[in-house]
Amino acid sequence: MSEKVNNFPPLPKFIPLKPCFYQDFEADIPPQHLSMTKRLYYLWMLNSVTLAVNLVGCLAWLIGGGGATNFGLAFLWLILFTPCSYVCWFRPIYKAFKTDSSFSFMAFFFTFMAQLVISIIQAVGIPGWGVCGWIATISFFGTNIGSAVVMLIPTVLFTVMAVFSFIALSMVHKFYRGSGGSFSKAQEEWTTGAWKNPHVQQAAQNAAMGAAQGAMNQPQTQYSATPNYTYSNEM
């Protein structure tokens, strides 16, 4: 088997840095979890785009007469939260679906609940916090309508992000509880060290893949094309 080479993030060749992670949905994730994993990845991408749009909104805020603090914080949130959200909550759920690890699920729940709270705060938009939320945007309409309209775009995106985050958290929690997962299982993985044992992880991944393939290849009940009836000659 060829060695897996890190391929994410896909950096341009002129940047003297190399990718930090290996990511291949089709190769790593069992088919029954593929759709959910990709949706969470798209949610991470939406979060990153929202932070970038928020930077533009805060620039319009600054040009319209707002303080420079919001623009500076918006830039900080972009360069800080984009990689941190990938490492802190997407990689754990990627690993959880890949290896069926209860510890990784718990790590995801813990960090993603923080992500949900942050998204709600961003949507609210407290002035001076570097986010174009509802309070900051609505209050700025009386100062500069043009800037406020631009600020409205990241405000809507923050709101969408908060709603989608709540839905995603509910769906993953429902799946985890339905599959028999629990906090005690995560504690057991932590105690035994199974969460960081590559052999255990590979065995769990192979078992998940095998279960998925078995479900898809399950033989169907065969029926005879021509029915065979036996009649009695006795009257």
Curated annotation (Swiss-Prot):
GO cellular component: Golgi membrane; plasma membrane; recycling endosome membrane; synaptic vesicle membrane; trans-Golgi network membrane
Organism, as annotated: Bos taurus (Bovine)
Functional description taken from the UniProt entry: Required for the calcium-dependent exocytosis of signal sequence-containing cytokines such as CCL5. Probably acts in cooperation with the SNARE machinery.
Alphabetically ordered keywords of this record: Cell membrane, Cytoplasmic vesicle, Endosome, Exocytosis, Golgi apparatus, Membrane, Protein transport, Synapse, Transmembrane, Transmembrane helix, Transport
Similarity-based family: Belongs to the SCAMP family. SCAMP5 subfamily.
Protein's membrane topology: Multi-pass membrane protein
Parts of the chain that traverse the membrane: 40-60, 68-88, 103-125, 149-169
Predominant cellular place of this UniProt entry's protein: membrane
Protein name: Secretory carrier-associated membrane protein 5
Cytoplasmic side: 1-39, 89-102, 170-235
Subunit structure: Interacts (via C-terminal part) with SYT1 and SYT2; interaction with synaptotagmins making a link with the SNARE molecules. Interacts with SLC9A7.
Name of a matching Pfam family: SCAMP
Biological process terms in GO annotation: exocytosis; positive regulation of calcium ion-dependent exocytosis; positive regulation of cytokine production; protein transport
Extracellular compartment spans: 61-67, 126-148
Protein's cellular compartments: Cell membrane; Golgi apparatus membrane; Golgi apparatus, trans-Golgi network membrane; Recycling endosome membrane
